[in-house]
Amino acid sequence: MIKFDFETHVDKNILEEYKELVSRKEEVLEQFNNSRMIGWSKHIGKNNIDKINNTANYIKNNFDCLVVVGVGGSYLGSYAFSQTFKKYFKPHPFEVIYVGTTLSSKFLNDLLVELKDKNYCINVISKTGKTMETKMIYNFLKDDLKKRYGEDKVKDHVVITTSDDGNELDNEPCIERFDIPQNIAGRYSFLTAAHLLPLATNFDIYEIVDGYYEGSNLIDEAFNYAGIRYLLFKHGKVVENYCIHEEHMLAFTEWLKQLFAETEGKEGKGILPMSTLYTRDLHSLGQFIQQGNKILFETFIRFKNSEIINYKSLDINSINNMVLDSVISAHYKGKTNILEITMDELSVRELSTLVYFFMLSASFTGYLFGVNPFNHPGVDVYKEEVKNILDEIITF
């Protein structure tokens, strides 16, 4: 169960304005339902899930590890999910290595050293088949495989996830191919093979799918979150700070940053997302939040139940929640508006539900801002600049 509290620590005048904003709910829902880009709200289908799961089992049975090559919406969701449930001092049972976010030569050199004695499979993910970083690193790894096994054997180490529009990547030989539907934008593609295939190597994706669709019951909560965020922006709160108290959720906040920044940040509008880990950042950014420029509001992501470890007759989770309650009280007294999202527990099922909730909220906020929630024209600007320089050099 996910609960959203926007009434306890939000200025009363904003809550009064929200009563009027609720009248726009039907308008926003109509825009959403009429969009051609909400394939992510439809059921993926059991046959697709089975195909993904069977391919993941093949990878686990035939390779030492999976190297996921992608960037942005192509992999942030699965990476964030995987990191959230990783043991602090122990890796997942099957190794999944995520690459594609940097073109650092040191990183790529270290990657080859890491893979030197491993029989690895590549899952290259790019909806357009044109993503520069993905093309470069995929070619880099293909060259390594060619040296090891010969050019004709590379295809036996590759799984491709792209759209079925005949792009360069769509024509690459491989073990298996998965399509990202045209009616799903990259950052909304959590319930496609782009994310489910890497996750299926270590998680029960049937449980992920079930939890995800439970988020469709949170339309009212999602609109409440979108509406309050929109009004806070109208009152000069142009930065949203996602506050977490579990370090493994830092990657999840990176996914949130991409989701909301790419959805809203257009036409001079949008809320800038940032994140803090408490209690760590109370000793740095906490000073700014308490007494600095009042340009931000906070969204706390909490969960009630956690592993119980006792300390002087109190369990650590209770102490942690007491600290968070104190932080919320202090920041609110310091004139920072605070929203709270609470899960019963940090579980695979509930986090999947939370993913749907956030995607629904992001799209609703986009409509409130009057922008298209599903495009990212600003990102395409840098891509065109790079294309002019490197397009002839980098091909699949």
Task: Briefly describe each language-model feature range.
Residues 149-298, 378-396:
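Active-site phosphate/pyrophosphate-binding segments
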Residues 84-94, 144-147, 259-270, 330-334:
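Short helix-loop-beta junction
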Residues 352-353, 360-396:
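Generic C-terminus detector
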Residues 1-57, 326-327:
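Extended, charge-enriched "interface" segments that sit outside catalytic cores
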Residues 57-219, 384, 388:
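Glycine-rich phosphate-binding loops that contact phosphosugars or nucleotide phosphates
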Residues 45, 98-101, 127, 131, ...:
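Hydrophobic alpha-helical scaffolding
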Residues 274-348:
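Helicase-primase coupling helices
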Residues 44-60, 221-233:
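A short, well-structured juxtamembrane/interface segment
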